Amino acid sequence: MDIGKSFSYVFQDRDWLKKVLIGSLILAVSLPFTAVLVGFLGLAIVSGYALEVLRNVRQGNTHPLPEWRDKWSEWMILGLKLWLALLVWSLPALLLSVFNGLGNQMMWTDSDLLGLFGGLMVAVVACLSLLWWIIVALVTPAISIRLAETGDVGSAFKVDSIYVWTKRNIGEVIIAVLVSVAAMIIAVTIGTFAGILLCLIGWVITIPAATFIANLISVHLYAQIGLRAGA
């Protein structure tokens, strides 16, 4: 896996600044409106754009960043499919949060026995939730590759094939996930400091830009696994 290429390919595009700026502006405008759901449409467009980048990398395009035109509705639908797939895969962890809340309430009762049971429940739920979130992170490359290639949300729920593919490529999948997390942390840290240097106002652009670039790094890593192993 060429990790360096995943970090550098964005900046090798002749129009990288324009493309990154547009993606960053979409994120900057969308994030404040996620509470009223409208913002999710912009986030979906960015996610769909990233999946197109993944597809282009797998097809061997030298400059895989597409132009921001003509395909916005297509990207939005593709991005919504990705979000739906990840939401469904995340449901077990989200449902466990109900028991976490119940355990917390039991801990604050006057009964020592209930408090002990509540504490044990919170600990067990925390471990199970962490385990499931790790599973979701590990299957995300396979889900992303399938959606990018087929556009069929049903392909994200073929549990057997996703499990087999992930297990067969588990070494590279773990590397890709860890590098993706590191890229997000590094990018957001740089974006935060850049925003401070720009008198905080710069955060409006620098943090969305950092998030956008980190996302592009992730899909390039996923595409590399797909190229080696097949979808």
Cite the ranges covered by each PLM segment.
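Short alpha-helical linear motifs
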Residues: L95-G103, A182-A187, C199-W203, A231
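Short, small/hydrophobic-residue-rich motifs at membrane-helix boundaries and re-entrant hairpins
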Residues: K18-A28, G39-T62, S73-E74, L78-I134
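Membrane-helix interfacial "entry" motifs
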Residues: D15, T62-L78, L114-G118, V122, ...
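Selective recognition of hydrophobic, aromatic-rich stretches within alpha-helical transmembrane segments
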Residues: P32-Q59, G115-A156, V188-A231
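Interfacial aromatic "cap" segments that immediately flank transmembrane helices
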Residues: D2-V29, W68-P92, L138-I190, V219-A231
